Regions:
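Small/polar/charged residue-enriched interaction surfaces, especially the RNA/DNA-contacting tracks
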Residues: 1-135
């Protein structure tokens, strides 16, 4: 973990949480906190590409994990526009092909940490069955 980079990423992460729809009306679904923590553990136990591939799949979880992958990409790139579903996977794959997978893994991990920290700036909320946040 690069503390300086994490500090640089926190404001980007705060914005990315809102831009990707993870945070809504000042609240964030608590399930996203658990998902981002398990993503970090998955990177530590396996590979960054396999973790991204798993989290890029639309599964039966309370949290839309594809939004987390988009948020991580937005934090790394500093982008706020439309982000493709597989943008983070494509980015890390390109870095791997350039021989920079270790650096890319560090950036992804730091972005995930920044997102986890930025989530604390939002009020906890729960998703109702309609998919909107309740406070």
């Amino acid at each position: 973990m690069n503390k300086k980079r994490v500090d640089e990423y926190i404001p980007r992460a705060y914005r990315a949480l809102s831009d990707t729809g993870i945070a809504d009306n000042g609240t964030i679904d608590a399930s996203y906190k658990g998902q981002i923590a398990s993503f970090g553990a998955m990177i530590a136990m396996g590979s960054v590409l396999s973790a991204i591939a798993l989290f890029s799949a639309r599964g039966k979880t309370d949290a839309d994990r594809t939004k987390l992958m988009k948020a991580i990409y937005a934090v790394i790139q500093g982008s706020t526009g439309e982000i493709a579903d597989n943008a983070l996977f494509d980015y890390v794959q390109a870095e791997k092909n350039r021989g920079e997978i270790r650096f890319a893994k560090e950036k992804v991990t730091d972005a995930a940490i920044a997102l986890k920290l930025a989530m604390n700036l939002y009020e906890p909320g729960e998703k109702n069955r309609g998919g909107t946040a309740n406070t």
